[in-house]
């Protein structure tokens, strides 16, 4: 018993000591179906999309999350809700084990009293006792198995939900370095291993401890001298298991890490399979995958070799123990210090010690895997969101949509992105932003939505510092349409409805699609709005995906609308129609980020960024008269037709 307790505590105290997570019960409402497989992959891959569209800030989760640095033996943080069920399950297990202990005693009575003593009238009662014990053992065994299966499912599901919910609270800076494949491995594979350890393996550990305790008690009751032999055997196996775990610890950490790498490679390759084929890189991708797959194979073979090296010792001790007991017990019978029935019972008890000793190697293996997985998961739980609501965060009664940047500077990973940015947009007005790639255009929107906080200066919405507003209200007030559209594997209707939390009717959905110039191609499809689009919108053209994304934004009807180069894949005619539609949104503040002059020439003011600074600002006509960067961009885009286009753009701006 002492050896098994030592084994269990060694893994869950020493290997997973420092963190345990307590989460608000509200996370239990997250459907389990949102976690595994492609759904989890889409949600993790679409973090930006979720933040842009969500009417509720992810920070709504993080305020309820507390990371407690406690010993892992206080895992009752998770099992606390089910403590009565655990007690009932352990009680059923104990009852089944007690009944198991009766078999050898009945056998002893049959040998000593019936066979040797000649009391044949006891045989019927003893056989009835065997039947009753067997029936009771079946009932309690079934209840034990069922209870632990249910508990493991509930706790494993809760851990997975809590981990996924915690990931949703993390700031954008975390996802700058994290990758989807690794997070998928943590949420799915690593949680499965912990689930197994807290469920089936945990049940076996408890069962082994109780079983061995009662067996040793019964053995000592028969002969304390003979009982020292199985006690020594258990001590030997326990020490061997601890030594084996130390060898497995590093291996399982490497296996967990390599599994995440393999998942990342597979996820990235499948997501970008068209790019791979376009560049004829299939051979390179196969070789890259095979290289990591070989390392994964080698690590698993190392783990197997360790198991193979140690496992025979557990088996040998388990098989040799009954034989040893038969020999030593036989000597005691010959000397008259032990009855034959007691010897038979003792041998049966020694056989009951066999399977726990043989299981030690297997339990060590699974607990080592779970400990390594827990370390990986713990690092995610210990991550804290950099961006969070202040305790005195303000909730505005009504958001009008005025936006202001006052001396804003921002650096990321030591690189200066924005320097002293100043501008203001009144509600309902339109601001155009142009500049070369990497000039800081998109960073302005990240700061406006508080994906990051500015290093200097102030970003304001309706005159309020965005850091003083709740993230939920701030992000639900700003709708962003990205150039890189993220669509989910669902119907077109559901992809459009995603932008608004309240239920939308088909009339509103069709209206949004019509205004986004998407109704034409949608209604030509066989299933129209019920058409299920593939992962990330596969099967749709870039322009079609952008139009669905614009429809989703229009359905949301936020006070501030940001178009981040979101018409780049549209033809000129469709783009002009959308520009006309945007011009009619008098109650919506519009920020249009683009590379094409045609997308911003109608704006009330245009900013031209260069190296993180505002190099030029003004209306289209004013910037053309300056003959600076904006003017040269116009000339480069329209060439010989620049004169005519300038006239057309002037009319359009008016």
Which residues does each PLM region occupy?
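Transmembrane helices of ABC transporter permease
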Residues: 81, 85-98, 102, 128, ...
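Helix-loop-helix
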Residues: 119, 218-232, 302-375, 380-381
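Short intracellular "coupling" helices and adjacent cytoplasmic loop segments at the cytosolic face
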Residues: 116-117, 153, 161-185, 189-191, ...
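Alpha-helical transmembrane segments
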Residues: 96, 100-104, 132-152, 233-248, ...
């Amino acid at each position: 018993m002492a050896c098994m307790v030592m084994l269990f505590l060694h893994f869950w105290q020493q290997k997973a000591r420092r963190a345990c997570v307590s989460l608000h019960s509200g996370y239990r409402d997250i459907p389990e179906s949102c976690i595994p497989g492609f759904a989890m992959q889409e949600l993790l891959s679409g973090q930006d999309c979720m933040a842009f569209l969500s009417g509720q800030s992810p920070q709504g989760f993080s305020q309820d999350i507390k990371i407690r640095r406690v010993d892992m033996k206080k895992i009752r943080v998770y099992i606390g809700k089910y403590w009565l069920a655990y007690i009932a399950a352990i009680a059923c297990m104990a009852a089944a084990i007690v009944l198991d202990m009766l078999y050898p005693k009945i056998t002893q009575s049959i040998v000593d009293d019936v066979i040797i003593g000649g009391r044949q009238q006891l045989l019927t009662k003893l056989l009835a006792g065997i039947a009753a014990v067997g029936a009771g053992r079946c009932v309690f065994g079934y209840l034990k198995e069922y209870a632990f299966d249910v508990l493991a499912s509930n706790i494993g599901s809760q851990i997975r939900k809590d981990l996924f919910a915690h990931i949703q609270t993390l700031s954008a800076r975390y996802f700058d370095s994290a990758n989807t494949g690794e997070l998928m491995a943590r949420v799915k594979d690593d949680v499965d291993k912990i689930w197994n350890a807290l469920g089936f393996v945990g049940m076996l550990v408890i069962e082994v401890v109780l079983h061995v305790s009662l067996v040793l008690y019964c053995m000592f009751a028969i002969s304390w001298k003979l009982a020292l032999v199985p006690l020594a055997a258990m001590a030997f196996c326990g020490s061997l298991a601890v030594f084996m775990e130390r060898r497995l610890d590093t291996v399982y950490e490497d296996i967990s890490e390599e599994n995440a790498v393999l998942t990342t490679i597979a996820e990235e390759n499948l997501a970008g399979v068209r790019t791979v084929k376009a560049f004829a890189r299939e051979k390179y991708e196969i070789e890259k995958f095979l290289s990591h797959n070989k390392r994964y194979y080698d690590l698993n073979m190392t783990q197997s070799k360790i198991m193979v090296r140690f496992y025979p010792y557990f088996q040998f001790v388990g098989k040799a123990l009954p034989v040893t007991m038969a020999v030593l017990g036989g000597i005691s019978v010959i000397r008259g210090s032990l009855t034959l029935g007691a010897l038979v019972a003792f041998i049966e008890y020694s056989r009951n010690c066999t399977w726990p000793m043989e299981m030690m190697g297997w339990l060590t293996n699974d607990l080592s895997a779970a400990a390594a997985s827990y370390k990986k998961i713990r690092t995610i739980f210990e991550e804290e969101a950099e961006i969070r609501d202040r305790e005195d965060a303000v909730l505005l009664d009504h958001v009008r949509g005025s936006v202001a940047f006052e001396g804003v500077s921002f650096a990321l990973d030591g690189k200066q992105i924005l320097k002293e940015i100043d501008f203001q947009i009144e509600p309902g007005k339109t601001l155009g932003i142009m500049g070369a790639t990497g000039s800081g255009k998109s960073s302005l929107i990240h700061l406006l939505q508080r994906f990051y906080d500015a290093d200097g200066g102030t970003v304001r919405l309706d005159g309020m510092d965005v850091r003083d507003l709740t993230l939920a209200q701030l992000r639900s007030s700003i709708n962003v349409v990205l150039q890189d559209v993220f669509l989910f594997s669902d119907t077109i209707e559901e992809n459009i409805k995603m932008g608004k939390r309240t239920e939308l009717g088909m009339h509103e959905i069709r209206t949004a699609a019509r205004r986004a110039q998407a109704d034409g191609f949608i209604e030509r499809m066989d299933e129209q709005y019920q058409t299920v689009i593939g992962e990330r919108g596969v099967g749709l053209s870039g322009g079609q995906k952008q139009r669905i994304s614009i429809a989703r934004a229009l359905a949301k009807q936020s006070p501030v609308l940001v178009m981040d180069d979101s018409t780049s894949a549209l033809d000129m005619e469709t783009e002009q129609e959308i520009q006309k539609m945007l011009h009619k949104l008098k109650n919506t503040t519009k920020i249009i980020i683009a590379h094409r002059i045609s997308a911003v020439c109608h704006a009330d003011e245009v900013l031209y960024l260069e190296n993180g600074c505002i190099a030029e600002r003004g209306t289209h006509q004013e910037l053309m008269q300056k003959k600076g960067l904006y003017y040269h961009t116009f000339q480069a885009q329209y060439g010989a037709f620049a004169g005519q286009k300038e006239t057309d753009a002037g009319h359009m701006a008016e």
